[in-house]
Amino acid sequence: MNELEFVTLHRRHLHQYPELSLHEFETTSYITSFLEDLGVPYDRPLKTGVIAYLEGNSHHTIAFRADIDALPIYEENDIDFKSKNDNVMHACGHDGHTTALMLFVKRCKALYDKSELPHNVVFIFQPAEETGGGANRLIKAGAFDKYPIEAVFGFHVNPFEKEGKIVIRDEEITASATEYRFFLKGLSSHVADKEQGHSCGEGLQHVLSQIGQIQQFHLNGLKRNIIHMGHFEAGEAINTVPSHGYLEGTIRTYDTEDLAIVKHQMHKIAKSVQLLFNVECEVKFEEGYPPTMNHPQLRQAVENAIKGANLEIVEKKLPFLFGEDFSFYGQQLAPSYFVFVGTQNNEKGFVTGLHTAHLNFDEKILIDVVNYYEHLLRNYKEV
């Protein structure tokens, strides 16, 4: 079996059997069976996910990560390897990420068997990137305590960049993701006696209008930020004053000062609702993933590896506004570098975005990724 056949076989199997965050049991079994067949040792520090390891010819230890979970999306692709799990799909390309790392394990094991593996390698098949913060869970569980990891590398497919191109950026490359929720409690009454009630409906209207003002009047317009309202509700009947209200959304920013400003303004909005509409109003925040920071000291190694793999470098001027839990590795484990690999192919119709029901790509790009990884490994110099 050649490498294209390898990545096609494994990626399409994984694509047919996607599993949601923290439920990647069959995916984990598939990976461990593959590792056992190769004779590669591994650990399972969590219920799902796998950490594999090969010892090389130096004291340097480098880690490579792939996320393995899928999304609650019904697949609409008309393909013979369409998802067989109802309303679950690899709509973010993690089937490709996993397959690429499997091929990289295979290459590294071949080098190991010939005593030619240049450095120690940790292979991270990580669960729960989409929800659950699998990277942070692995770190907190001590999964890497026995490995003196010096650098962590990872990638994500990018359907908005053409095949053969890799997008890089020093410092922030993805945004932080913070969820916010407004809770309103008022007093219900019949609509004919609405003056007897305290309307959460009007309170919600105020929250909505004021959230829209934050970005316009309180944040630097030259920076990229998103304050998105995703869901709201109030009341239960058409002829009553709503006694409760709820609104939730997400904040995407790569600047901690901007995030602090947004939170401060939202607290002010909650207080103003209480004063203006005589309803209780509280806002709560759930911290998601911090910005993914690419460490500049790894830049030259990444550039050299991309060029060595005969791929094209695309310099990203501004960070992506995705959230990505790869950020925890750079924040808590070791210097890290995360890139985006182009998968766009207009002739084959591979043009739809991430988290859509039609995401697809040509498996050959996974070999490009592994070539890039191998160049990183062979030419790695201590940070």
From Swiss-Prot:
Which SUPFAM superfamilies does the record match to this protein? Bacterial exopeptidase dimerisation domain (SSF55031), Zn-dependent exopeptidases (SSF53187)
Tell me where on the tree of life, at the top rank, the source sits.
Bacteria
Q: What InterPro entries is this protein classified in?
A: Amidohydrolase (IPR017439), Bact_exopeptidase_dim_dom (IPR036264), Peptidase_M20 (IPR002933), Peptidase_M20_dimer (IPR011650)
Keyword hit for Hydrolase: yes
Which Gene3D superfamilies does this chain map to? 3.30.70.360, Zn peptidases
Stored NCBIfam families? amidohydrolases
Q: Which protein are we looking at?
A: Uncharacterized hydrolase SE_1078
Source species? Staphylococcus epidermidis (strain ATCC 12228 / FDA PCI 1200)
